[in-house]
Amino acid sequence: MNSSGIYRKVREVIDVDSRYYLVGGDYPCSNPSLLVCPWSQDILSQLDVAHRSLFPAVLTTQLALDRKGVTFLKPRTSGNSSSYVQSAMEEAHSEEWARQTIRYLSDCERHKKMATFIPSAAVYLPPPTFRPLPLAQWFETVHSNDILSHLDEMKGVITSTYGRILKMDSTKKITKKLAGGIGDSAAWISNIGNEFGQVLNSVLTSGEGAGLEELCQGVVTRYKNAGQAEPEAIYVDRDCCSQSGVSSVAKLFHPWQSAVRLDSFHFMRRFNCGLTTEHHPLYGIFCAKLSSCIFAWDQEDVQRLKEAKRAEWKSSHSGHTPTEEQLMATISPGELKRHCRRRTRGVEEIRGMISGLLESVWELTDTTGLRLVSHDSMRHVWEVQQKHLECLQDPAGVALYTKVGTLQKGGKELDILRCGRGSSSLERTPTVGYSCVFTLQ
């Protein structure tokens, strides 16, 4: 290829507050019928990363957007959208156009005063009119083109995500957010995530349970190819055990020998079938009591939190020591969850406590006389769910809590903990760093 001047076409680029033109060199090939565009993807892909990063814009069919403008499309903050970026940049363009117009008219006026003694009158052209920016949809196209240019890197990041504790869950909540032509193409989404809330793999299907074998074996293959150790535990919302001894989930993740456990949230939700209504005034109290029947707080963590809160109380109450009741009243449920670990009680302890709870609420009613518990339904629910008490137990030797930071409270340093137990977090749309590959089946 030899240079023969400037390429016959130029590209208009929209900057943050102005426009400029992209000019390239003309490098004809030895074949005269073969035209080579200097900014084609085939040419740019041959450059090394350092030189490719110098290319200033993201191209579309007609126009291009400077990379400084593309940066504004990337933040996932609340309220940021292509419409917001389009309106903000158009405002910046209009202000710059107004400044340039005022400068041009001022120069014309000054030139007119200086040309008073020239016989022929000077002719001044009107300033150029303001050119609106493209619609917000064009900015979305630019953002899509920018993402596609990093597709290989994004795939590499997504498929390099692993975890010690995996969670598998199927839900309809996310598929209800699908719009457009694919709005009714899927009814369920099944996700596999790790203890950090990252999604390893997803599949969109027309029914619950479909495509799970390919989903799970894909994760197994990923671990095998990367030389990663198999997860220590897998939390699921169903099929945690089997009368034959090998659960369906264990078969899906064959040949892994990871412990399969039932998510406690889904276990407690099954008791709703034994209640008259979820809108009963005593429903919240019942759920809180049921949770306390399954879990017990780590007393060492609770004691450290109480010492920190006691010191905090003394500093704000002139050194007075609070009573136990006053101290416990200052500890919120959020603080317990943030700084204290929980463990599952033993099988027989859970069985006895839930049985006692059901006996205590058996005849409870609201002010209208509506019972909280439907007797026949609850008897059947409890009879069936007792076989899953073993599936609720914490896996032996598995650290379910991760320290993510520290916090100073009352002069004491407290750990901020993240729990890896449970799968219900996969039922909602993640808000930070959600990256996954969707497969339609």
What is the predicted role of each segment?
Residues 1-46:
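Short, conserved DNA-binding cores of transcription-related domains
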Residues 1-19, 164, 168, 394-409:
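Long, contiguous regulatory modules within eukaryotic nuclear regulatory proteins
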Residues 33-147, 151-157:
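Intrinsically disordered, low-complexity acidic and serine/threonine/proline-rich regulatory regions
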Residues 41-44, 178-182, 203-206, 216-218, ...:
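Short coil/turn segments at secondary-structure boundaries
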Residues 108-233, 240:
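RNase H-like nuclease fold core
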Residues 234-331:
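Conserved beta-strand -> loop -> alpha-helix junction used to position metal-binding or nucleic-acid-contacting
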Residues 238-239, 300-441:
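Acidic/histidine-rich catalytic cores and adjacent linkers
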